[in-house]
């Protein structure tokens, strides 16, 4: 069973459909977009003082909008959807870190 699944996957990777997918914007658009969530995840190690609330909010709205787009477009672009879902979660975490930081500053003042 596993051998048949591997064989089927290998046949698909060698197919013209897969090559066409690799050369389409349905593949390269999300690949380029992965820079946003990677940067947000990397910024989680940094001080919350550098977080911009406005930019975090804008990126949350952007990712929600394009998650909907990736779902509605035909054929559905699951790679783009996953990219923006990851970015949405990362930005919400960054927003939470910013709020926690601002609250602790007010509490200590």
From Swiss-Prot:
<protein>
    <recommendedName>
        <fullName>Mitochondrial pyruvate carrier 1</fullName>
    </recommendedName>
</protein>
<comment type="similarity">
    <text>Belongs to the mitochondrial pyruvate carrier (MPC) (TC 2.A.105) family.</text>
</comment>
<feature type="topological domain" description="Mother cell cytoplasmic">
    <location>
        <begin position="42"/>
        <end position="52"/>
    </location>
</feature>
<keyword id="KW-0812">Transmembrane</keyword>
<dbReference type="GO" id="GO:0050833">
    <property type="term" value="F:pyruvate transmembrane transporter activity"/>
</dbReference>
<dbReference type="GO" id="GO:0006850">
    <property type="term" value="P:mitochondrial pyruvate transmembrane transport"/>
</dbReference>
<feature type="transmembrane region" description="Helical">
    <location>
        <begin position="53"/>
        <end position="71"/>
    </location>
</feature>
<keyword id="KW-1133">Transmembrane helix</keyword>
<dbReference type="Pfam" id="PF03650">
    <property type="entry name" value="MPC"/>
</dbReference>
<keyword id="KW-0472">Membrane</keyword>
<keyword id="KW-0813">Transport</keyword>
<feature type="modified residue" description="N-acetylalanine">
    <location>
        <position position="2"/>
    </location>
</feature>
<feature type="topological domain" description="Mitochondrial matrix">
    <location>
        <begin position="72"/>
        <end position="109"/>
    </location>
</feature>
<dbReference type="InterPro" id="IPR005336">
    <property type="entry name" value="MPC"/>
</dbReference>
<keyword id="KW-0999">Mitochondrion inner membrane</keyword>
<keyword id="KW-0496">Mitochondrion</keyword>
<keyword id="KW-0007">Acetylation</keyword>
<feature type="transmembrane region" description="Helical">
    <location>
        <begin position="21"/>
        <end position="41"/>
    </location>
</feature>
<comment type="subunit">
    <text>Homodimer. Forms heterodimer with MPC2. The heterodimer is the more stable and dominant form.</text>
</comment>
<feature type="topological domain" description="Mitochondrial matrix">
    <location>
        <begin position="2"/>
        <end position="20"/>
    </location>
</feature>
<comment type="function">
    <text>Mediates the uptake of pyruvate into mitochondria.</text>
</comment>
<dbReference type="GO" id="GO:0005743">
    <property type="term" value="C:mitochondrial inner membrane"/>
</dbReference>
<feature type="modified residue" description="N6-acetyllysine">
    <location>
        <position position="72"/>
    </location>
</feature>
